[in-house]
Amino acid sequence: MAKVISIVNQKGGTGKSACTANLAVGLAQKNMKVLIVDADPQSDVSAGFGYRDCDESNETLTALMDTVMKDEDIPSECFIRHQAEGIDIICSNIGLAGTEVQLVNAMSREYVLKQILYGIKDQYDAIIIDCMPSLGMITINALAASDEVLIPVEASYLPIKGLQQLEKLDRTVDEIRRRFGYFSIQRAAMYQDKVLSH
């Protein structure tokens, strides 16, 4: 059964999507079967794997979550796109922002994503969720479905200073742990080589 890993940081531009893609490729190169769940309406990780048509598609995480909230059958397999690299992906689109609002009034709102993954976890070694830069209901869903949480942080002055804000995230995650079960948190420092031109 798959280990579910969420890539989370409430700040944008921290490398969550790059971390998601690189982790997925690295695991696939070790002959692991990997599913990426793009849980960010910006769809960067979907686009990074060549899916730039997601805003026009009905086969996205948005449609899957809407299906669960309507208490309809979950045809998860129909929403999974297969890559030659051995990485599958459930794409996102801009409609996920609307789903975030709908989740506020949904039954068992924290478990919608977990319910989606339940039926397909045994097909994968790892499921990696690329979260949006917020602690809204979609991210809460990702955390509730996760075994591990990875928080990418750029190793430079302002992001390191911003680690203080992660204390707030830690408190939120601790509350989610108490409500939904244990998962571990890892912080990853992202180093970027910069080339100065003369």
What residues fall within each predicted segment?
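P-loop NTP-binding core
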Residues: 1-167
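Acidic, metal-coordinating catalytic segment for phosphate/diphosphate chemistry
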Residues: 168-198
